Amino acid sequence: MPSICQGNWDCQNCPKAVGNAIAHIIYQRGFHRPAHKCEENFILFLMKGEMLVNSQEYAGTMLREGEFILQAIGSKFEMLAMTECECIYYRFVQPELFCDLRFNHIMKEVSPPLIYSPLKIIPELQYFLNGSITYLKGDKVCRELLSLKRKELAFVLGYYYSDYDLASLVHPLSKYTNGFQCFVIQNYKKVKTVEELAQLGGYTISTFRRIFQ
């Protein structure tokens, strides 16, 4: 059977390679990322260490080894590594982690947590993350492989975590991704002027400026 790679074994230079959405990062003790507005949705899995995080959902929360949180696009997030921290970030734009039926069910039938707490990394999720570390270290990755890993993560979260657990992921996603700020963050690089951005979103320029203020 002929190779689909057509003899090109350098995956980083393959035409099918895309930006990697799964990143393995180690922060040294004392590393501080000031409060900033997230330009992507991401799930932060803390494999080792302790990290102090601060956001609207996780105000002054100590994230410990074996826990994870989600931060939605447009939300403000700050972090401080209390010890050396080993992390895996999974970044995404659209909430592809759930089927529409499950997402809508949680939105309608399951209330958001009164107090948000990090979720535990169960063994099945740990296996997925350990496997991801071993061969997803490059800046780029095969498009088909990344698609499979997205689906695998979606399956693990959807199959092994309850609706109540997933509510702490779904509700922030819905809150931020349906908003005006999310639209601006996702699209401002695609245009050159405010007028073009307003037109892209179906706004009149006066309405766009009023909402943006």
Where do the PLM segments sit?
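Aromatic/histidine-rich interaction motifs
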Residues: R102-L129
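Basic/polar phosphate-binding segments, predominantly the helix-turn-helix DNA-binding elements
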Residues: Y159-D163, V191, E195-Q213
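A short, N-terminal "cap"/entry segment at the start of jelly-roll beta-barrel domains
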Residues: M1-A17, Y135-G138
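Short, Lys/Arg-enriched N-terminal segment that forms or immediately precedes the first helix
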Residues: F31, Y161-L169
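A short, Lys/Arg-enriched amphipathic alpha-helix from helix-turn-helix/homeodomain DNA-binding modules
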Residues: I121-I133, L146, R150, A167-K192, ...
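N-terminal regulatory/effector-sensing and dimerization cores
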Residues: P15-E109
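C-terminal effector modules of nucleic-acid-centric enzymes and ribosome-associated factors
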Residues: V141-R143
